[in-house]
Amino acid sequence: MEAAVRVIARSGVRGLRVEELAAEAEVSTALLYYHFKDRAGLIQRTLAFISDRATGYTDEAVSGTEDARTVLLQLLLSEIQDTDRVRENSIAWGELRASAIFDTELRATLAESTRSWTQDTAEAVSDAQAAGLADLRVSPLDVADRLTALVEGLSERWLSGSLTLERARELLAGAVDAELGPRPE
């Protein structure tokens, strides 16, 4: 699956060829077809892998963090960091999101993955509210939708060279403060 993410990050979804992936993964095309049945199955499984891998590095980012507001911020900032794993994931996610416009099967899978990410983010907002670290008047789901959409947009701008990594992270931190209200003293 890592090879599929690398190929998509390098060549895009439209550039994903089973032969190229087989070479990247050092396996036969027959083995890929055996496991994934077809290109669509491969893309669906790659999306699931991307989501699982993102969960891994977001969990790492909040490990040992006890302040609920900081947990939310670190969850979001972990999606915009200069590591091969995050860069590949972000590029592949953006490619899959763009492809979902034209692919209804992929659209449904991507929508479910997005709902899960948004729900996790909304729960982090609720935790910050329960801890007295966020304005109780804000809707956790609305905040989560806006912040996850912002992460995607900032990530695309950073990856395409329109923003520096530092500026993207600074803007995201500012958005968390704007959404949650001032941090209580």
Segments from the language model and where they lie:
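Hydrophobic/aromatic-rich alpha-helical bundle segments in the mid-to-C-terminal region
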Residues: 107-111, 115, 129-179, 183-185
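Hydrophobic alpha-helical connector segments
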Residues: 45, 56-90, 140-147, 169
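Short, basic, alpha-helical segments at the C-terminal edge of helix-turn-helix-like DNA-binding modules
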Residues: 48-54
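Helix-turn-helix
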Residues: 3-41, 45
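A ubiquitous short alpha-helical element
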Residues: 41-43, 75-82, 108-115
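Amphipathic alpha-helical segments used for helix-helix packing
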Residues: 71, 84-107
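Solvent-exposed, amphipathic alpha-helical segments
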Residues: 3-10, 57-61, 92, 96, ...
